[in-house]
């Protein structure tokens, strides 16, 4: 598969493996990767050396690697770091899709760099890469209202209405991936942040 090198060469969708977590809010990043695989004809394969399920797809002519880390959320950096090291992908060329409790269900926001905001998957990726300088695609799953309820909230399934909102957000985000690969960050932000 030969394609142009896009602005982002690796898209990591965060989540937890296994049927127990399949429909939970914490797996929103997995759902985005699944949608990209569906749209662009890729095939996710277990790649033990990369600690995740990986695919390589062409998106509007851009060669892009996708990964769903199979390390559980708190060790997501193992998969992202392994791929980045092997394929010599700098942090600036990595986009990480993840659930975001600080956004209402159905919201999508792009962010370059910054802190982890208490998200353990981002924390581990930042630690593994040695920098926060990777991009994030934040998929809103809403906040439960109290910090003691955050873990049960993200590890539970969304209501039917929230699920519809999240699915729409994932579609909207997937629609903008070609723009992001083309380096049209501002235009993608305008579409998603509107």
UniProtKB/Swiss-Prot annotation:
Listed GO MF terms: peptidyl-tRNA hydrolase activity; tRNA binding
User: What EC number(s) does this enzyme carry?
Assistant: 3.1.1.29
According to UniProt, the reaction catalysed is:
an N-acyl-L-alpha-aminoacyl-tRNA + H2O = an N-acyl-L-amino acid + a tRNA + H(+)
Q: Site annotation (Discriminates between blocked and unblocked aminoacyl-tRNA): which residues? A: 16
Q: Which residues form a coiled coil?
A: none
**Site positions per UniProt: Stabilizes the basic form of H active site to accept a proton:** 99
Keyword Cytoplasm carried by entry: yes
* Signal peptide residues on this chain, from the entry's feature table: none
Compartment(s) of residence: Cytoplasm
Question: Where on this chain does tRNA bind?
Answer: 21, 72, 74, 120
Biological process annotations from GO: protein quality control for misfolded or incompletely synthesized proteins; rescue of stalled ribosome
Which controlled-vocabulary keywords does the entry list?
A: Cytoplasm, Hydrolase, RNA-binding, tRNA-binding
**Which InterPro entries is this protein grouped with?**
Pept_tRNA_hydro, Pept_tRNA_hydro_CS, Pept_tRNA_hydro_sf
Q: Which residues form the active site?
A: 26 (proton acceptor)
Show the NCBIfam families listed in the entry: pth
Question: What does the subunit comment say?
Answer: Monomer.
| Stated role | Hydrolyzes ribosome-free peptidyl-tRNAs (with 1 or more amino acids incorporated), which drop off the ribosome during protein synthesis, or as a result of ribosome stalling. Catalyzes the release of premature peptidyl moieties from peptidyl-tRNA molecules trapped in stalled 50S ribosomal subunits, and thus maintains levels of free tRNAs and 50S ribosomes.
Give the family, as the similarity comment puts it: Belongs to the PTH family.
The name of this protein is Peptidyl-tRNA hydrolase
Q: Which gene encodes it?
A: pth
């Amino acid at each position: 598969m030969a394609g142009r090198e896009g602005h982002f060469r690796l898209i990591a969708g965060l989540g937890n493996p296994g049927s127990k977590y399949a429909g939970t809010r914490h797996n929103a990043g997995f759902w985005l990767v699944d949608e990209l695989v569906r749209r662009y004809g890729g095939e996710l394969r277990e790649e033990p050396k990369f600690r995740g399920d990986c695919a390589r797809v062409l998106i509007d002519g851009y060669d892009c690697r996708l990964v769903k880390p199979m390390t559980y959320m708190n060790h997501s950096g193992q998969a992202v770091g392994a791929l980045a090291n092997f394929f010599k992908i700098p942090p600036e060329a990595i986009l990480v899709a993840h659930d975001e409790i600080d956004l209402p269900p159905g919201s999508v926001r792009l962010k370059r760099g910054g802190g982890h905001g208490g998200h353990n998957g981002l924390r581990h990726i930042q630690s593994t890469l040695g920098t926060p300088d990777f991009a994030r695609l934040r998929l809103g799953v809403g906040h439960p209202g109290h910090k003691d309820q955050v873990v049960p909230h993200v590890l539970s399934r969304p209501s039917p209405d929230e699920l519809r909102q999240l699915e729409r957000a994932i579609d909207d985000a997937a629609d903008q991936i070609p723009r992001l690969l083309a380096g049209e960050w501002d235009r993608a932000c305008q579409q998603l942040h509107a």
